[in-house]
């Protein structure tokens, strides 16, 4: 069977634009999409699972529509990151009220387990723009400064973000899990 891309979005404007360029997009969420069982090789949640009301049920639905041995990919803000600890309430990825849930390595592993997946791999990374966005919030609201980041700080932040990501403390959590065969 040739590769098939199917998308689901709860944003009507995004759905309309995607459909206008020929993409196969359904409006709604995974729980209401009605995909057939054992159909997909991969289900990808890219910064979306933290927005759903029932992440366990959503992942259970992903498991249902995956073929045996199929994989689920999660890309999530990492509440256990050095960024979250450093910036506290000013970490940009808390993003209330849009983010209904926050995950770290342990809670994402538990979530995947509750949904019936077997964890394969978890890593982290940090983007310089996310890190500097948090720094901007901190300086503006806590330090009461409109300080802009110079090129030296941007380069230092870039190197720091790479190191934090490789050490497992990055601001983005990347988890891969498999539906048992």
Task: Describe each region flagged by the PLM.
Residues 90-94, 104, 112, 135-140, ...:
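Generic alpha-helical propensity signal that fires on short helical segments
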Residues 1-90, 102-114, 172-180:
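Conserved SAM-binding loop
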